[in-house]
Amino acid sequence: GPEEWVK
């Protein structure tokens, strides 16, 4: 989810 994509 977005918490993964924020990298």
From Swiss-Prot:
<keyword id="KW-0964">Secreted</keyword>
<keyword id="KW-0134">Cell wall</keyword>
<dbReference type="GO" id="GO:0005576">
    <property type="term" value="C:extracellular region"/>
</dbReference>
<protein>
    <recommendedName>
        <fullName>46 kDa cell wall protein</fullName>
    </recommendedName>
</protein>
